[in-house]
Swiss-Prot record:
Protein name: Galactokinase
Site location (Transition state stabilizer): 28
Lineage of producing organism: Bacteria, Pseudomonadati, Pseudomonadota, Gammaproteobacteria, Enterobacterales
Any single biological process term in GO: galactose metabolic process
GO cellular component: cytosol
Reaction(s) the record says it catalyses: alpha-D-galactose + ATP = alpha-D-galactose 1-phosphate + ADP + H(+)
MF-aspect GO terms: ATP binding; galactokinase activity; magnesium ion binding
Family as reported in the entry's similarity comment: Belongs to the GHMP kinase family. GalK subfamily.
Keyword Metal-binding: yes
Alphabetic keyword roster: ATP-binding, Carbohydrate metabolism, Cytoplasm, Galactose metabolism, Kinase, Magnesium, Metal-binding, Nucleotide-binding, Transferase
The encoding gene: galK
Annotated binding of Mg(2+), by residue: 130, 162
Length: 382
């Protein structure tokens, strides 16, 4: 049963009438450009064919009812007429409440809604299940009540909800690619202007995501420390963000910086340059150059930004040994576990899957999860 059929059926059972709309918003994988988003830099993600799906209908009162199919059909209910506060027990509900509250704060006028939510974006894997949920909820209200919001505004609203209501300092990339993704393309995003450029993906190349299944948490983790270190670096250069610092400026005074901060800054500056170059390599179908840039990105995350773990490095090495210079592989996401992403010619996928199955668990004691994805369309009706 598809997520659409599942949520429509649950909706009718739970609420006693049929849903009027079904909305989807995809998860994402970032091909290159890690931790650059909150430094006003560049990222190159693509939306993937794993998504959050919401069957919904408008109500004629001011009540919001939300059922989470993936959490034993837990039900959250709140009113649009009283201040929206955090749910004491259901963390999933806070993503919904946060999005609704921030849409209100943006002076959008809308009525009540019934929703049933289900998704297949793996959670805790760094594939943006939370951003996909935020964008899906924002798109539901935009569609049901014809709100004057474009994809970028729905994305910004989701980011605000996660930063201020849920309490995680995420950048804008995850929500933006979920809202604006384009089938068969990656999206080069300028995280300062929010300008996007669709970059066509080479034919015959699979986007493979392998979850290390080494558990990670983002809220309250090292993520926020890295962000502070980057802000310290920007202050040292008296710039609003590291986006405004050149490699030459950095090299001239790197020795004056705290050594740890210097490493963090170097990662961001070199990663930005790699990301812009990667977009052209991808567009030209130059998988060899793309692979080199992904390898440099991984080394920089491992040695300068220090966000990889041995399990992730092992996975990258196993894949690299199979694909050589025919594709690319690196850690993706916030770090400290999660997933690696690989761009691999389709004919090499079985060999990669076999090598990983034979070696990863033997070396780490953890069984991986293997996903072959297609670059997919952003949020909308399904």
């Amino acid at each position: 049963m598809s997520l659409k059929e599942k949520t429509q059926s649950l909706f009718a059972n739970a609420f006693g009438y049929p849903a009027t709309h079904t909305i989807q918003a995809p998860g994402r994988v970032n091909l290159i450009g890690e931790h650059t988003d909150y430094n006003d830099g560049f990222v190159l993600p693509c939306a993937i064919d794993y998504q959050t799906v919401i069957s919904c209908a408008p109500r004629d009162d001011r009540k919001v009812r939300v059922m989470a199919a993936d959490y034993e059909n837990q039900l959250d209910e709140f009113s649009l007429d009283t201040p929206i506060i955090a749910h004491e027990n259901y963390q999933w509900a806070n993503y919904v409440r946060g999005v609704v509250k921030h849409l209100q704060l943006r002076n959008n006028s809308f009525g009540g809604v019934d929703m049933v939510i289900s998704g297949n974006v793996p959670q805790g894997a760094g594939l943006s299940s939370s951003a996909s949920l935020e964008v899906a909820v924002g798109t539901v209200l935009q569609q049901l009540y014809h709100l004057p919001l474009d994809g970028a505004q729905i994305a910004l609203n989701g980011q605000e909800a996660e930063n201020q209501f849920v309490g995680c300092n995420c950048g804008i990339m995850d929500q933006l690619i979920s809202a604006l993704g384009k089938k068969d393309h990656a999206l080069l995003i300028d995280c300062r202007s929010l300008g996007t450029k669709a970059v066509s993906m080479p034919k015959g190349v699979a986007v493979v995501i392998i979850n290390s299944n080494f558990k990670r948490t983002l809220v309250g983790s090292e993520y926020n420390t890295r962000r502070e270190q980057c802000e310290t670096g920007a202050r040292f250069f008296q710039q609003p963000a590291l986006r405004d610092v050149t490699i030459e400026e950095f090299n001239a005074v790197a020795h004056e910086l705290d050594p740890i901060v210097a490493k963090r800054v170097r990662h961001i500056l070199t990663e930005n340059a790699r990301t812009v170059e990667a977009a052209s390599a991808l567009e030209q179908g130059d998988l060899k150059r793309m692979g080199e840039l992904m390898a440099e990105s991984h080394a920089s995350m491992r040695d300068d930004f220090e966000i990889t773990v041995p399990q992730i490095d092992t996975l990258v090495e196993i894949v690299k040994a199979v694909i050589g210079d025919k594709g690319g592989v690196r850690m993706t996401g916030g770090g400290f576990g999660g997933c690696i992403v690989a761009l691999i010619p389709e004919e090499l996928v079985p060999a990669v899957q076999q090598a990983v199955a034979e070696q990863y668990e033997a070396k780490t004691g953890i069984k991986e999860t293997f996903y072959v994805c297609k670059p997919s369309q952003g949020a909308g009706q399904c």
